């Protein structure tokens, strides 16, 4: 019997690394996909390569996109500052339609690979309030995937799996540690330096640090 395949979105951060480990533990052959989309730094792409290697991905693919050509986000437009204090509403670090774009490309690769499962590390508990991290979005994308693909209309449906959806950051970290994730390889910071060191001030850094503290696990994050 052939091993079931999964395409997994891997940013190089804590959440997506955990998802790779969870999929592997569930018996999937893992095909990881990252995006060089014009983000502020390349440290997360280097982290994604390290994580894919450590967790035994069958293939790690990096797709080039020019989302900074559109701008509209502090992560793709250097003229918009990354906030270093909590904010109300959807923060300026939201990248317009990013998860829709990423999942669409993962869907295409999954169809080529004849993989039925696509994993994404979105979370609706300890998160920044992005609309494309909500359960409603994941469910809607799965419906679209099965309407928009040859595989879907022929009855070989896709599943969009978001195993972290209802977990706290501490629970995510505990799940990853139990499955052998080396979080020292990951980068979560929105404005990490060239060595992957974190600022310790942005929303992503705060969520990460609070998660390690709540989990009672030492935080391996290097800071500048």
From Swiss-Prot:
Swiss-Prot/TrEMBL keywords: ATP-binding, Ligase, Metal-binding, Nucleotide-binding, Queuosine biosynthesis, Zinc
Residues at which ATP binds: 10-20
Gene Ontology terms: biological process: queuosine biosynthetic process
Cofactor: record remark: Binds 1 zinc ion per subunit.
Required cofactor names: Zn(2+)
Enzyme type, top EC level: ligase
Binding site for Zn(2+): 189, 199, 202, 205
Pfam family, one: QueC
The keyword Nucleotide-binding is annotated on this UniProt entry: yes
Entry superkingdom: Bacteria
Listed pathway(s): Purine metabolism; 7-cyano-7-deazaguanine biosynthesis
GO molecular function terms listed in the Swiss-Prot or TrEMBL record: ATP binding; ligase activity, forming carbon-nitrogen bonds; zinc ion binding
Function of the protein: Catalyzes the ATP-dependent conversion of 7-carboxy-7-deazaguanine (CDG) to 7-cyano-7-deazaguanine (preQ(0)).
The protein, known as: 7-cyano-7-deazaguanine synthase
